[in-house]
Structures are given as structure tokens and as C-alpha cells.
């Protein structure tokens, strides 16, 4: 690689002979190397240097070569602390020099120098330069990839589900993940790499990644296809910071998994899509051997007649059994719900949502609400065209909206609503609800009514961590699938002075001092922000165990999550909520509760990249008969 200055780039992503003026172009390039020439074109180099020199005025460390880019990065601190001042200075210089360097370009260079320890970390500057904060404000970076189109992407024919032969079942070209998949020939390595590098360039840490695998029904793909696909995801994660000039060969899936435990870019969770009736002992064992931690499954509806109408071929009994088996064996559960299906009405769907909210057998961790859309390549489009199916979202839109508002107000605090409305472009929707930003519309209407929703997503701390010091552990118990779920979370309330918590502290101190009894706080009712949470399951005695017998009498920690600005695992004292002991305290509390419920230990469905975290607290990896790691276990 030719060098034009003393700055040597470690990460290689575009052709060294090509000048790229827009970093988005880098991602679609099929070449591998990047040089300073490709990041900053020759004809703009002097302009950019003059731009940066004038914007900054700072004496650098004399041991570091004076560099106009570094001068720009460490300019006046007042500029960094004020978004308005930063933008004003930026715009003035853009006008003067008739050029506009992207923030992502500047931030990319900043991170290069930071990784080489040439410059100190500047958190305020990062806040000004990072784009799309929302991508990592939930504590992890989510990368969605899609399986290749295949004759067996789904062997079922649900009448609402599009079957475009060019793509995996239920997906269309216009969806963002599908577009990225097609650009990368549905290759797992390329999809992961291009998405991760895009995030990295835009300023997000990429050392904690959660993978969502989309595309039909995962269980319908042949094991060889699915295993190789996941192997390539781990390979991409393990080698993302390697020199592409000397790339190593792919190893087996299980070798790549072991490498990922100690990689810079760790996969901390994998989500797959399947059907409730596909949840079996064999399938759950296979999922764990792949590193899968979360299962998305389509419930769609609770009325068997409606499910039969749309040829779902899956009954309520099968749905409940699948949910129970997965939860009893430690998995996180996301469910998909479809109001406005053929033969449904607002009254029927209201009853459906009531059932899913209140019935212990339907309790899930996350929801995706997908109002039925009439699309090409579906059977229901024929019914729609002939007039035998008329979605009530068209005939009674206000009732449709009011139903969803009621749902959002009624969601229990242990559930997260991930999405409302599929990501279909508006021009693909031929009938039913055509509002593509439906969640935003609902959020606005709820805000107008001054209502605070209690679901997890509505209460996430995001980047506003100013009340983190007020967070306390709140416990919620609820029945679920013939077992008990304990939802522990760090929350803060909007009370001026929380009398309930004050009284709890006094009672807790006295009971512990005189009787050795632990008292738990169940909330004051005014909690408005969540910082972290943990899901602990205590299964019934005779539940169906899919794994080793040592797994049976354990409290299952199905999820541990800390929200807020995502900090790198290499930051020992990052800003925001992460790395401040929230996870440790929840883990300790869960172990105490499991002990009180006569468990002989706890086990965690730990993502591959989180195993070392749990080892710090006495957890050890449990191996199956094929010597594949499954759960992290701690015996009391």
C-alpha cells in the first residue's frame, strides 16, 4: 500500500486507486484497500487542510507530528460543548472554502488516531461528530442480515405472506435489509462486514454486536446452509480488523465461535426467525450450538379460525407449547402479532390483544405488531381484488388507530415493542394500513394525551443519563407458561421525593439487621426511565429439559441488558450508563432470588461474546455431548 503521509491506516476497505468522495460509496465497493488519497481526494486535500487549520487553534503534543486533521479534532473545547457553535463554525468554513467534509470522514480519521494512541479521547467532540446516535443508544449495535433466497426458505404457504421468487419468503426488494443483502449477493460475510464498517465510520463502537438473521423460516433451511451462514458471520466478526491482504482461511463454525470469545468485535447475541410449531428439543439444541440466544416466532393471532382462514397451519396449542419449551430452556422470545387479518374485526383483535397481554401462556419478552398489508405475491391480494377481504384499517381508520393506542397503553413493563408496521415501502402496499411511519403517528397521539407508556422501549434511558444516580432495583413477578418470571430492572422515578422508596429503605435495613431477611422493592408506580434489566425464570418441577441434567434445577437468566450510550468493552470508565455496575448488581440479586426459590444454581444463555463477562462472576461454560458450549452455569 502506498503511503502519502506518516498516517498509516490499519483498516482496509476500498480500492487504493479509486478516489471516493462519499463514504457511502466505500461500502458498495468490491475492493479492499483504503489510503488517505481515497478518503480525501487530491484535488480537495489543500482545501480540507486549510479548512481544519482555520477551525482549530490548539497546541498538540510535541511528540505527535503536527497534522491539520489532528488540529481540527482538538479544537477549542467551547466549540465541542455547543452543537450550535460547532455547526456555525463548520458552515462558515464550508462557505469560505466551498467544500463540505463529511463528519463521518473526520470521525473516521479521529478513530484511527485514537486506536493508535496518538491522541487522547475527547467525548464532547465525539458527540458532535457521531451520526445516527439511535443505532447504538440501546446499549448494543444491532446488525440485520438476510439469508439467501432458497426453494426451502419456508415450506409453508401462509396466505398473507408474499412469495416473491427472487427473495426469501415474506421479504421484498424495497426493504432496507433486503437491499443490503442483494448488494452483497446475500453473502453473510459481506453483509456483516459492510454494515459494521458503515457503523464504524459513523462513529459507533463495533465491539458488541447483536445479529438478527432474517429470511423465511430459519428451521426450513438445510442445516448445512444455516451452519455455513452463521459460521461466516462469526468469521466476519473475528477478522473485521485484520489486514485483508493476508486474510486467513475460514475455520469450522465451532472454532470461529471459540475465537469470537476473545475477538475485538464480539457477537453478543443471535436472533433467528422460525415458527412455534418448529420449536423442538432437537431444534433448540441446534440453535444453542450456533450461538443463538433469541427466537422470533409468528403468533399472528389467537383465534384458530382466523389462523385456519389464512392457512397458517399452526394452532394455539402449538403456539403455547413452543413458547413454553423455548422459555423453559433459557431462550428469549419475540412474537409477531398481526391485527386486521381476513375475518378479523376491531372487536376480535381487541380480544386477541387482551389474551396475549393477560394469558400466562402467551407471555413474551418482545413484540412486533404487524398490521396486515395487502401485497403482491400473496393469496389475500386475490381476495382483496375481488372484494371478499376489506381491511378495517381502510373502512374504519380511527378505530384501527384507537385499538393500537389502547395496546400501547396496556403493555406490561416487562415487554418491549420492537416495531409497529413492517418495513415495506409505501408503494409496495396495495391495501390495509398504508402509513409507513405508524409508530411515530401513534407516539405523537399518545403524547398529545399526556400518557406515559410503560413498555421497555418507551422508558429506555437512551442518551439521557442525568438521573442514573437515582436508579434503584425494582422487582416484578409474573406467571408465564407454567413457571414464574422475575423481571429485575434499574429504574428511576419522577417523584420529587419518593416516600415509598424511603420507607422501603428503612424496612429493608431493619429486616436485614435483625432477621437476615432480604426485602425487595416493587416500585412506586411513578417510574419513567429504565437503565438495565434482567429476566430470571423459575421453571416448574417437571418441565421439558432439552439440555444436560445439570441444567435442570437452575434459575434461568434469560436476558441481561444495560441501556444507554453504547460504550466499548475496552473503556473501563465510559460515559453514560454502561460499565457502572448495573449488570453486576442485577446478577447478584437474581442469584439471591434463585437461591430463595430452592434452585441449586443459576445459568445464563450467554451470547458468545459475553462469556468472559460472566466468568468474572464465577460462571463456567457448560459443554454438550459434542463438546459445544451451551450455557454459562454457576452452582451455589
Predicted region positions:
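Flexible, acidic/Gly-rich N-terminal and inter-domain linker regions that tether
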Residues: 2-178, 182-191, 195-245, 413
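Conserved non-cysteine loop/helix-boundary elements of the Radical SAM core domain that shape
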Residues: 173-191, 211-235, 240-402, 577-580
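Short, electropositive alpha-helical surface patch
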Residues: 224-232, 345-364, 424-443, 614-625
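Radical SAM enzyme [4Fe-4S]-AdoMet core and its adjacent flexible, acidic
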Residues: 371-416, 422-467, 569, 573-577
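A conserved beta-strand-loop-helix scaffold within acyl/acetyltransferase catalytic domains
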Residues: 479-494, 516, 525-565
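Conserved acetyl-CoA-binding loop-helix of GNAT-fold acetyltransferases
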Residues: 573-593
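Conserved GNAT acetyl-CoA-binding A-motif
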Residues: 593-606
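Conserved active-site alpha-helix within GNAT-family acetyltransferase domains
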Residues: 606-634
Amino acid at each position: 500500500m502506498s503511503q502519502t503521509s506518516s498516517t498509516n491506516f490499519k483498516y482496509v476497505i476500498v480500492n487504493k486507486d479509486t478516489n471516493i468522495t462519499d463514504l457511502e460509496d466505500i461500502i458498495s465497493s468490491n475492493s479492499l484497500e483504503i489510503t488517505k488519497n481515497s478518503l480525501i481526494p487530491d484535488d480537495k486535500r489543500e482545501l480540507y487542510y486549510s479548512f481544519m487549520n482555520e477551525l482549530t487553534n490548539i497546541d498538540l503534543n510535541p511528540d505527535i507530528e503536527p497534522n491539520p486533521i489532528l488540529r481540527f479534532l482538538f479544537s477549542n473545547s467551547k466549540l465541542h460543548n455547543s452543537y450550535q457553535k460547532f455547526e456555525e463554525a463548520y458552515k462558515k468554513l464550508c462557505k469560505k472554502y466551498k467544500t463540505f467534509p463529511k463528519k463521518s470522514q473526520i470521525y473516521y480519521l479521529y478513530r484511527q488516531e485514537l486506536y493508535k494512541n496518538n491522541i487522547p479521547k475527547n467525548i464532547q467532540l465525539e458527540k458532535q461528530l457521531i451520526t445516527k446516535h439511535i443505532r447504538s443508544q440501546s446499549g448494543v449495535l444491532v446488525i440485520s442480515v438476510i439469508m439467501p433466497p432458497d426453494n426451502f426458505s419456508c415450506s409453508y404457504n401462509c396466505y398473507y405472506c408474499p412469495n416473491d421468487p427472487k427473495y426469501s419468503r415474506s421479504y421484498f426488494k424495497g426493504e432496507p435489509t433486503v437491499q443490503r443483502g442483494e448488494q452483497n449477493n446475500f453473502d453473510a460475510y459481506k453483509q456483516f462486514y459492510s454494515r459494521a464498517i458503515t457503523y464504524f465510520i459513523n462513529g459507533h463502537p463495533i465491539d458488541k454486536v447483536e445479529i438478527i438473521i432474517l429470511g423465511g423460516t430459519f428451521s426450513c433451511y438445510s442445516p448445512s446452509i444455516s451452519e455455513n451462514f452463521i459460521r461466516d458471520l462469526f468469521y466476519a466478526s473475528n477478522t473485521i480488523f485484520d489486514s485483508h491482504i493476508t486474510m486467513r482461511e475460514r475455520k469450522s463454525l465451532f472454532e470461529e465461535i471459540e475465537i469470537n470469545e476473545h475477538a475485538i468485535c464480539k457477537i453478543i447475541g443471535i436472533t433467528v426467525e422460525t415458527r412455534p410449531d418448529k420449536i423442538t428439543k432437537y431444534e433448540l439444541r441446534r440453535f444453542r450450538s450456533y450461538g443463538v440466544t433469541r427466537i422470533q416466532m409468528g403468533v399472528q393471532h389467537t383465534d384458530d379460525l382466523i389462523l385456519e382462514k389464512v392457512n397458517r397451519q399452526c394452532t394455539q396449542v402449538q403456539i403455547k407449547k413452543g413458547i413454553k419449551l423455548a422459555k423453559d430452556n433459557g431462550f428469549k422470545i419475540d412474537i409477531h402479532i398481526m391485527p386486521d387479518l381476513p375475518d378479523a374485526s376491531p372487536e376480535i383483535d381487541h380480544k386477541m390483544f387482551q389474551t396475549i397481554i393477560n394469558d400466562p401462556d402467551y407471555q413474551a419478552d418482545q413484540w412486533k405488531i404487524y398490521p396486515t398489508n395487502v401485497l403482491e405475491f400473496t393469496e389475500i391480494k386475490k381476495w382483496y381484488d375481488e372484494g371478499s377481504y376489506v381491511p378495517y384499517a381502510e373502512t374504519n381508520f380511527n378505530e384501527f388507530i384507537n385499538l393500537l393506542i389502547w395496546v400501547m397503553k396496556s403493555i406490561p413493563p416487562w415487554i418491549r415493542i420492537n416495531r409497529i408496521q413492517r418495513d415495506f415501502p409505501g408503494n409496495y402496499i396495495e391495501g390495509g394500513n398504508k402509513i409507513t411511519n405508524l409508530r411515530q403517528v401513534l407516539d405523537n397521539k399518545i403524547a398529545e394525551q399526556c400518557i406515559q407508556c410503560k413498555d421497555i422501549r418507551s422508558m429506555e434511558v437512551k442518551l439521557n443519563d442525568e438521573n442514573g444516580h437515582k436508579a434503584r432495583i425494582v422487582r416484578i413477578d409474573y406467571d408465564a407458561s407454567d413457571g414464574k418470571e422475575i423481571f429485575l430492572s434499574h429504574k428511576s422515578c419522577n417523584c420529587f421525593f419518593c416516600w415509598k422508596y424511603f420507607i422501603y429503605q428503612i424496612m429493608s435495613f431493619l429486616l436485614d439487621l435483625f432477621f437476615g431477611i432480604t426485602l425487595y422493592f416493587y416500585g412506586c408506580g411513578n417510574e419513567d426511565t429504565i437503565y438495565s434489566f434482567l429476566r430470571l425464570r423459575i421453571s416448574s418441577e417437571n418441565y421439558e429439559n432439552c439440555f444436560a441434567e445439570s441444567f435442570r434445577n437452575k434459575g434461568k437468566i434469560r436476558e441481561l441488558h444495560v441501556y444507554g450510550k453504547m460504550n466499548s468493552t475496552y473503556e473501563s470508565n465510559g460515559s453514560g450508563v454502561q460499565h457502572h455496575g448495573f449488570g453486576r448488581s442485577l446478577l447478584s440479586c437474581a442469584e439471591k432470588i434463585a437461591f430463595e426459590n430452592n434452585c441449586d444454581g443459576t445459568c445464563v444463555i450467554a451470547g458468545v461474546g459475553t462469556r468472559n463477562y460472566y466468568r468474572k462472576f464465577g460462571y463456567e461454560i457448560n459443554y454438550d455431548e459434542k463438546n459445544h458450549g451451551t450455557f454459562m452455569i454457576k452452582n451455589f
